[in-house]
């Protein structure tokens, strides 16, 4: 039964409490819902109906102590097993270790380039600083991956690093252009390795690893490829002669401004 009341009407219970919030408006006044009415001695008596439902809207009640029992049984008790590891597959762990090795190898190559251009008979200080900073950046990438490996409960397994080149002079291109083209190739190779790591994470439904690779590596790698590509284009324009020195000075000044 629905009871229509005038807008100015105030409904009180036996204790004098206002029940007006229980009213919903309509075009003709107020409609009282979930209440039954009856007349007693000429007075209107309103009683709460039994149709109210206090169950959760979704029908699902979260019971943490019941649901955590399964996870509690999986907590390792052996000291050699990681306590933090959760939803981290062996494939993802191995792929992260491979990427650590890639970053260290690229860092080693860049460090060799830094040593070459810092020689007294080469003396291209701008290129030397650029490759030294690039080497430190790649090593930082490797260390960041190592930290992530430990964070996820994996084990860091360092692999061997190949000996890099020590000479970068090229008969046709010259040392500056040859080294920068090599750096561009390494940047693209690193990007491909990162894409492979992201694919492994996606294949194993590891959303956290995929997000880590996207946010910390892939965006930055695209920017590095663009920057090195511009350096290659500029070095191709200036040739092997006096223009290389001007390019090196420009590079040195840019790095000093950034620093």
Swiss-Prot record:
Family annotation (SUPFAM superfamilies): Ferritin-like (SSF47240)
- Alphabetized InterPro entries for the sequence: Ferritin, Ferritin-like, Ferritin-like_diiron, Ferritin-like_SF, Ferritin_CS, Ferritin_DPS_dom
Specify the enzyme's EC class, one word.
Answer: oxidoreductase
GO molecular function per UniProt: ferric iron binding; ferrous iron binding; ferroxidase activity
Q: Binding positions for Fe cation 2?
A: 138, 221
- For Fe cation 1, which residues are the binding ones? 103, 138, 141
Q: What is its EC number?
A: 1.16.3.1
Segments traversing the membrane = none
Query: Which terms are listed as keywords in the entry?
Result: Chloroplast, Iron, Iron storage, Metal-binding, Oxidoreductase, Plastid, Transit peptide
One BP term from GO: iron ion transport
Q: Where in the cell is it found?
A: Plastid, Chloroplast
Query: What positions does the domain Ferritin-like diiron occupy?
Result: 86-239
Q: Which reaction does it catalyse?
A: 4 Fe(2+) + O2 + 4 H(+) = 4 Fe(3+) + 2 H2O
Q: What are the boundaries of the region Extension peptide (EP)?
A: 53-85
Q: Where is the transit peptide?
A: 1-52
Quote a single Gene Ontology cellular component term: cytoplasm
What is the annotated quaternary arrangement, including any partners?
Oligomer of 24 subunits. There are two types of subunits: L (light) chain and H (heavy) chain. The major chain can be light or heavy, depending on the species and tissue type. The functional molecule forms a roughly spherical shell with a diameter of 12 nm and contains a central cavity into which the insoluble mineral iron core is deposited.
Q: What does this protein do?
A: Stores iron in a soluble, non-toxic, readily available form. Important for iron homeostasis. Has ferroxidase activity. Iron is taken up in the ferrous form and deposited as ferric hydroxides after oxidation.
Family in the record:
Belongs to the ferritin family.
Q: What is this protein called?
A: Ferritin-2, chloroplastic
Species annotation: Nicotiana tabacum
